[in-house]
Amino acid sequence: MAATLRELRGRIRSAGSIKKITKAQELIATSRIAKAQARVEAARPYAAEITNMLTELAGASALDHPLLVERKQPKRAGVLVVSSDRGLCGAYNANVLRRAEELFSLLRDEGKDPVLYVVGRKALGYFSFRQRTVVESWTGFSERPTYENAREIADTLVNAFMAGADDEGDDAGADGILGVDELHIVFTEFRSMLSQTAVARRAAPMEVEYVGEVETGPRTLYSFEPDPETLFDALLPRYIATRVYAALLEAAASESASRRRAMKSATDNADDLIKALTLAANRERQAQITQEISEIVGGANALAGSK
């Protein structure tokens, strides 16, 4: 009985230690969500405007540019999977990896080989464990991405995309770049504090659309200089970098929101466990005291009877 009581008290101490960790993680995630959400909101207008500008440029010229034109018989599709560097964020990574696997299956059904690029240690570990080839990976900034991080990733993706037009083989070309005919980004879209959804978006060839309140306001008119082809060559890296940066910011906000929710649930569960264990320990202690009193009374009665 004494051993059982010691075991219960040990479990209470362990649960209390875990609760301190989860509560601290919850508070840290809570403090980061507001900043991450503000960065997402600040980046959206720029991403929308550069998309609008490219849409207008495409509509104003009959340009046969790789960013706009679907390639005949595409063979490979580059897929950037954005995950987290750390765990303790619930189903965040599982959802984005599941969405990536769904995209891989869809691409293979269309006769396209996925070429994998990864952001975050969790996705890198997942694909490495399954012996899947990762062309390039970036880690260490999933919670606080910068535009420089996005531009570094975009440079790699743009080089692969532009090399796709001349790359006819199944291996890397003479320049060491494995060309791709499409670019996709799989990330977690931040919709609200309680809603984050893993999505897959095609970044190139560009799906031409006008982003904005077309029905309620006038459409912006642009005057372009120099020629459209030069503009597209200059804007392509910036467009891809903007798409990547927006995805990184959405993913960072989603990661913090998922971690806060997971840690709050873990803290609440630790509270419930501590209460249950404390109740069990009190009952065990009460039973122990009752038994000791019974033994004392029994001993006293035995002594009285012997007299």
Swiss-Prot record:
Keyword Cell membrane attached: yes
GO biological process: proton motive force-driven plasma membrane ATP synthesis
Compartments in which it is found: Cell membrane
Any one GO molecular function term: proton-transporting ATP synthase activity, rotational mechanism
Chief location bin: membrane
UniProt cross-references to InterPro entries, sorted A to Z: ATP_synth_F1_ATPase_gsu, ATP_synth_F1_gsu, ATP_synth_F1_gsu_CS
Alphabetical keyword list: ATP synthesis, Cell membrane, CF(1), Hydrogen ion transport, Ion transport, Membrane, Transport
The protein's role, per its UniProt record: Produces ATP from ADP in the presence of a proton gradient across the membrane. The gamma chain is believed to be important in regulating ATPase activity and the flow of protons through the CF(0) complex.
Alphabetized PANTHER family for the sequence: ATP SYNTHASE GAMMA CHAIN, ATP SYNTHASE SUBUNIT GAMMA, MITOCHONDRIAL
Name of the protein described by the UniProt record: ATP synthase gamma chain
Lineage of producing organism: Bacteria, Bacillati, Actinomycetota, Actinomycetes, Mycobacteriales
